[in-house]
Amino acid sequence: MGTQKKGPRSEKVSPYDTTTPEVEALDHQMDTLNWRIWIIQVMMFTLGAVMLLATLIAASSEYTGIPCFYAAVVDYELFNATLDGGVWSGNRGGYSAPVLFLEPHSVVAFTYYTALTAMAMAVYTLITAAIIHRETKNQRVRQSSGVAWLVVDPTTLFWGLLSLWLLNAVVLLLAYKQIGVAATLYLGHFATSVIFTTYFCGRGKLDETNIKAVANLRQQSVFLYRLAGPTRAVFVNLMAALMAICILFVSLMLELVVANHLHTGLWSSVSVAMSTFSTLSVVYLIVSELILAHYIHVLIGPSLGTLVACATLGTAAHSYMDRLYDPISVQSPRLIPTTRGTLACLAVFSVVMLLLRLMRAYVYHRQKRSRFYGAVRRVPERVRGYIRKVKPAHRNSRRTNYPSQGYGYVYENDSTYETDREDELLYERSNSGWE
């Protein structure tokens, strides 16, 4: 009997497998559509950042047709409520004094920091878009929109653009001395900035999901991993520091609104600003440590931003209370020590939170044996190697530039430029016990 030939073995397809050519084509079309929408959002965000920077430059110059300097919100030299120069509040002692606000150069510094940070983030997203386009052409990335959303998702771009346009309107209103309207509009800018910073830090997902997605990106492209990982962490810290400054501004803007509409006394308006700033800052630092730090472990932006805000507000408060000492002493003699004590306690709290975050980040990276921990451990060795290279070169340059020429020129501290190997060995032994 002849042997029966077996036909080709048919492949069994799982009923749960929906990967068909039609589905792949549909996924590709949706990915292309999402990618193009994301590119449009990036362009609009870049336009918003450019317009904000252009508005600040125009509002800072007297030759652009804008009537007033936007940063001069209050004028402590004027004591007449009928003059324009800021928002004014009376008191029981018969005086008339402006409310507490930042000095003009501080306002300029913070607003330009906001604009430059937005410009840097716009350049960052444009570079990311170019690299994703290149990697997609090289067949290293399949879903370009998914990788783009790991860097900046569309929700973040939307709220970021809205916050930039609101700040642009605030600057123009301040330049036209519409202080009350500008202060009210800044409350909306603060709300959008909170949403923008929150989404930019966490992408609206759980921390473990973000960590796994970024880790898997290393297999596709090292450049994209660096953009979505370490580089993005730097921008998160910049935005976190900016959020602390926004808390300072919204506290003072709320003070302007209260003083302008409720006509409160001098000490009442200052108390509103100080209580709002201290409360929001403490809540922000705690939320950053308990929630946001799970996404970016080396998150030092909130503490540093709060520390800078305390120093800036302390400088403005000192100048304010020095000029208006008489009405303050009449209304509330305890206002000056209370303000100083509040700012000092908040500054100490921000330093404590900064040290706590650095310690927890170090412990986390040491347990994970991450690349960041390895890079940190190599820093002292690199510094010592750099010092060994610089010291002999510096010593030779001194002897070359100052020859003795027979005069017996002697350097008293010439031994400080020589490398003492015994000290280095003792230093290494002393550090070995800590490893």
Curated annotation (Swiss-Prot):
Localization per record: Virion membrane; Host Golgi apparatus, Host trans-Golgi network; Host endosome membrane; Host nucleus inner membrane
Subunit structure: Interacts (via N-terminus) with gN (via N-terminus). The gM-gN heterodimer forms the gCII complex.
Pfam families: Herpes_glycop
Superkingdom, natural source: Viruses
Transmembrane segments: 37-57, 112-132, 156-176, 179-199, 234-254, 266-288, 295-317, 335-355
Residue ranges, Intravirion side: 1-36, 133-155, 200-233, 289-294, 356-435
This protein's UniProt keywords: Disulfide bond, Glycoprotein, Host endosome, Host Golgi apparatus, Host membrane, Host nucleus, Membrane, Transmembrane, Transmembrane helix, Viral envelope protein, Virion
Main localisation: virion
Database matches in HAMAP family: HSV_GM (MF_04035)
Job of this protein: Envelope glycoprotein important for virion assembly and egress. Plays a role in the correct incorporation of gH-gL into virion membrane. Directs the glycoprotein N (gN) to the host trans-Golgi network.
Membrane topology designation: Multi-pass membrane protein
Stated name of the protein: Envelope glycoprotein M
Family, per entry: Belongs to the herpesviridae glycoprotein M family.
Description of post-translational modifications: N-glycosylated.
